[in-house]
Regions:
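Solenoid-like repeat scaffolds
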Residues: 32-40, 68-79, 107-116, 144-152, ...
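Conserved small/polar residues in nucleotide/adenosyl-binding loops
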Residues: 2-4, 9-15, 213-217
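TPR/TPR-like (Sel1-like) alpha-helical repeat modules
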Residues: 173-190, 199
C-alpha cells in the first residue's frame, strides 16, 4: 500500500544517504539496523552494490549479484544501471583471469533489449570465444548482439565475431557468410577486418563521401 511504499522509500533514502557519506564501516552498521522486511529492497541492494564496487570489494559485490541473479528485468527496476555495475565487475574479473566467473556475471544480466542488452551479449560472447573457447555459447551471444543492433559499426562488429566463432568450429561456409556481411561496411574497423578475412592481401578503396558511423553498442 501507499504507507508501506512511503516507509520503504524513507528507509531507503536514509540508508542511501549513509552509503553516500560513508567511506568505511558505517554502511554495514546502517544496513544491519534496517528491518528485515526492507533489507531486500532492490534499490538498497543496488546502492550497496555500487558502494562496494566503487571501493573494489569484488567478492562482496559478487555476493550481491548472486543474491539477485534470479530477479527479472522488471524486478530489477533499472536493469540498465545494474548492468553498468556488472560490466565493471566483469572487467575486473577478466583482469584477474577469472574467466568462468566473468562469463557467469556477464551472461546473467536479465536484460531483454536496448543498447545495454547488446553490450552485455557481446561481452559474454567475447569471453566465451576468447577465454573459454566455447564457440557454441559465443555464437549464441553474438547472434543476440547481431540481431539487436542497427548501426553499421555494430552490425560489422557482430558479423566479424560470428565469422571468427564459426571459423573456430570449422564451419567455413557460415564464417564466410558473416565475413561477407561485415565487409559491406568498409568504413568501420570490423568491416575492414571482415574484408581481410575473405580477401587476404587484397586492397580496398573508400569513397570520398563515405559517412562516419556512430554505434548503438
Amino acid at each position: 500500500d501507499l504507507y508501506t511504499a512511503s516507509v520503504v522509500g524513507s528507509v531507503r533514502m536514509c540508508i542511501r544517504d549513509r552509503i553516500l557519506m560513508s567511506n568505511s564501516y558505517g554502511v554495514d552498521n546502517a544496513i544491519a539496523k534496517v528491518p528485515d522486511r526492507f533489507k531486500k529492497d532492490i534499490g538498497l541492494e543496488y546502492d550497496r552494490l555500487k558502494w562496494r564496487n566503487r571501493r573494489g570489494r569484488l567478492e562482496s559485490s559478487l555476493q550481491i549479484l548472486y543474491d539477485n541473479s534470479n530477479r527479472s528485468e522488471e524486478e530489477l527496476v533499472r536493469a540498465d544501471l545494474w548492468w553498468k555495475q556488472r560490466e565493471s565487475i566483469v572487467r575486473s574479473l577478466i583482469y584477474k583471469k577469472r574467466y568462468k566467473t566473468a562469463y557467469k556475471v556477464a551472461s546473467e544480466h536479465s536484460l531483454s533489449s536496448g543498447p545495454e542488452f547488446a553490450e552485455a551479449e557481446w561481452l559474454a560472447g567475447w569471453i566465451a570465444h576468447s577465454f573459454l573457447k566455447s564457440q557454441e555459447y559465443a555464437i549464441n551471444h553474438f547472434l543476440n548482439f547481431y540481431d539487436n543492433v542497427s548501426y553499421p559499426i555494430s552490425v560489422a562488429r557482430g558479423a566479424y565475431w560470428l565469422g571468427k566463432s564459426y571459423q573456430e568450429t570449422g564451419n567455413t561456409k557460415k564464417a564466410e557468410e558473416y565475413f561477407k556481411a561485415g565487409s559491406k561496411f568498409l568504413t568501420t574497423y570490423y568491416g575492414q577486418l571482415s574484408f581481410k578475412e575473405i580477401n587476404y592481401g587484397g586492397e580496398f578503396t573508400l569513397k570520398e563521401d563515405c559517412l562516419l558511423y556512430t554505434s548503438d553498442a
